[in-house]
Amino acid sequence: MTDQRLRQNGVNNVLLAYSPGMEPNSVEEYLERYPGDDMIDVIGTDIYQYDSLQYKEQLDKELAIMTTIGKQHDKPIALTETGLEGIPDSTWWTQTLLPIVSKYPLSYMLVWRNAREKVTHYYAPYPGQASADDFVEFYNSPKTLFIGDDFELYK
C-alpha cells in the first residue's frame, strides 16, 4: 500500500485525503469505507457542477457532513476536487462557489485540470475567459486565501 511504502522510505510530507467519490446523505454513509484516523490526514470530497441548483444543494450538504466528521475525528476538511467544465457562468466563482465554501472551515479547495488537448475541458479561467474577471473578484475576496497571499501563518 502507498501509505506503508511512504513510511518505509521516511516520507513524512505527504497528506492522505479520504474522498470517497460519492454523494453521502449522512455522516454514517460518508464513513462506510473510512480506513481510520491513523490512515487519513484530510477529510475530503470531489463534487462537480452539472446542474446549478443541485450542485449548490449537494455541496452545502456534503460540506456540512464533512465539517461534523472533521470535528469528530480532529481532521481538516477539504474540497479535494470541484469545478464547472468550461465555466460558462460568468459569475460562478462569486455567486455559486464562494457563498457556500465560505460557510465552512475548508483547509483547501482544488479545481480540476485545464486539458491542453481538449479545448473546452478546463476548470480554471484564463485571461479573456467568460469567468476570468469574476475569478479575480473571488481571489480578492477577504474570504479566500491563496498560496501566494501575504499572510502570517506561524506568527
Predicted regions and their residues:
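Short, non-transmembrane amphipathic alpha-helical segments
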Residues: 1-2, 97
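Extracellular/periplasmic catalytic domains that process cell-envelope and extracellular macromolecules
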Residues: 9-11, 34-39, 70-72, 102-104
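Extracytoplasmic/secreted cell-surface and envelope-processing proteins
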Residues: 25-29, 51-55, 87-90, 118-121
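Aromatic- and acid-rich polysaccharide-binding/catalytic face
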Residues: 30-56, 112-114
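Substrate-binding cleft of secreted/luminal carbohydrate-active enzymes
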Residues: 75-155
